[in-house]
Amino acid sequence: MTAALYRNIQASLRMYFSGKYSSGTWYIDRKNENMTEDSFIELQTSMGRAQDDRKAYQYDFTQLLVHSKSVSTLDTIIGTLTAAIEGAGAIPVMDYVGYTPPSEGEPPVAHTQVGELQISRYELSQQSTISNYAVRAITVYYEFIE
């Protein structure tokens, strides 16, 4: 897998999930250590289970770590995201890295689709507590299809 494809997968996952829950604060593969938000979501990606030289890894996963100071808000966010996963089927992977914006005066150009992430399953963790946040993780397993 190329670095560009990996970044496109990250960006596509974030665009998909943040579009399904747009009122939250999102972090990709990191979080703000000085967070003050009442709730936020970390999107963490993992690659490397069954490598193929020509394609992306099979059965990779992403983890959505949902943090909230309110358990009812946590449950609402989890419900919204799991509904988005169950209804997704496949998530399009767009070329965000290689995108060139149009010149001034030219009409906008859509991002090119380079493949899709076929969701095979997801797992929902039990609720835990970190600092003063209630936390649950959604682990989504997928395969990249060209």
Residue ranges and their predicted role:
Residues 113-129:
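Low-complexity, intrinsically disordered Gly/Pro/Thr-rich segments
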